[in-house]
Amino acid sequence: MTVDDNSLPADLAKEIETYRKLFWVPTETLHKVIEYFIEELERGNADGTDPTGIPMNPAWVLEYPNGSETGDYLAIDLGGTNLRVVLVHLLGDHKFTTEQTKYHIPSHMRTTKNRDELFEFIAQCLEDFLRSKHPDGIPSDAVFPLGFTFSYPATQNSIFEGILQRWTKGFDIPNVEGHDVVPLLMEQVEKRGLPIKIGALINDTSGTLVASRYTDELTEMGCIFGTGVNGAYYDRVKNIPKLQGKLYDDIDPESPMLINCEYGSFDNAHKVLPRTKFDIRIDDESPRPGQQAFEKMTSGYYLGELLRLIMLDTYKKGLIFKSYTESSEQIKYLETPYFLDTSFLSIAEADDTPSLSVVSNEFSNKLFIDTTFEERLYVRKLSQFIGTRAARLSICGISAVCKKMNHKKCHIAADGSVFLKYPYFPERAAQGLSDVFGWDGIDMKDHPIQIKQAEDGSGVGAAVIAALSHARREKGLSLGLKK
């Protein structure tokens, strides 16, 4: 047999047809989701406090970069396992160079009881980095504006602050939630006498948009398709009712305002997304049921779990893995939540060997299950259905923003592990956009709206935003709510 052979046993063929229909998102459903998505974007700009809606957080970036920005800027990106420190040289003419170092965050530090320990560590890394770049001593007249990429839920009343709402990514440090993280860091920076001043605190999605706009002025939106999903775009101040009466007079109603949507929470009210019983189970058994509804159907974190649940369901019907009893170690693995990650689907989709031998090895190595060719073909097809649904739903956020802002021709800057590593994701997303906007017969490379690989959002994006805020501050203009 070959991977192109569609012959499955009658019972599995019937099962696969059921899942093909269940996971296919027709164009009319996409239109329905997009229409409601636009309503949610508008509602978030009007209020943003509805727990079933999209927060639509103003990011306090009030200009577009035009590629002429110059200067040397520091950027830090606090991830779950590493701290990345980047020196960004903005050269103008849409060009830049970077120098960077990654510092491993000791695991105990993510749950330390002393909040100063984390910020001491970050400041020490900044000092080590600067000294490595200036072995003869840091110039006495140097001042490095710092772009701080802080990709944790935070409230911002200005570009220079970020009040942590809740820790994620394995961090759980007391006395930081509810506090502004910028002074906590700058206290440690100042103790070391480092010539650093805060230039901006940003989210990685905002940075993705701005970094890409710096090099490509057709960029209108930044998106993350990874373990989480998110989008950022520029709206107009006049379109954000929740800010009216709260801004200084120097901010023009026509001014652009970068919005960090945090639209993983789209449709938390479960009105339009085509959820299956498996999606409902994932939500019900998650730490936060009823939250991040869109993320749970599109992000890399959940795709492996979807496949696991369907395989387990098929096994319990007696259709696959027939030689293994429910008490066997192999089935215990299959019953373990989140035992499979998205790489399992990626490998299944990418395997073009005649007997699907790569998939066979994955089953042997991860689940210790010996599979038949038909079982492997079944799982490969399931992976295709799950991956295609995620890609088609993912473009609903892009389509909603483009329709709302009347962007007829633009680029969407995309980053994240699913976009970069999942087979056929970009092509399926492009096909979804084509179906929504009616581009039949137009080659993908000629589509009016194109998804492009983003520039480094958490490094270069943070630096460009720091440059924009520095220029605005030099003019004496405001960058936040009225005090």
Language-model segments: what does each one mean?
Residues 1-100, 104, 108-144, 190, ...:
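ATP-binding/phosphotransfer module of carbohydrate and carboxylate kinases, centering on a glycine-rich
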Residues 71-77, 143-147, 200-202, 220-224, ...:
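Short glycine-aspartate micro-motif
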Residues 76-84, 151, 205-206, 224-228, ...:
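A short acidic Gly-Thr/Ser loop motif
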Residues 103-123, 154-213, 220-221, 237-265, ...:
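Glycine-rich phosphate-binding loop and adjoining helix at the ATP-binding site
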Residues 146-156:
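Conserved beta-ketoacyl condensing-enzyme motif
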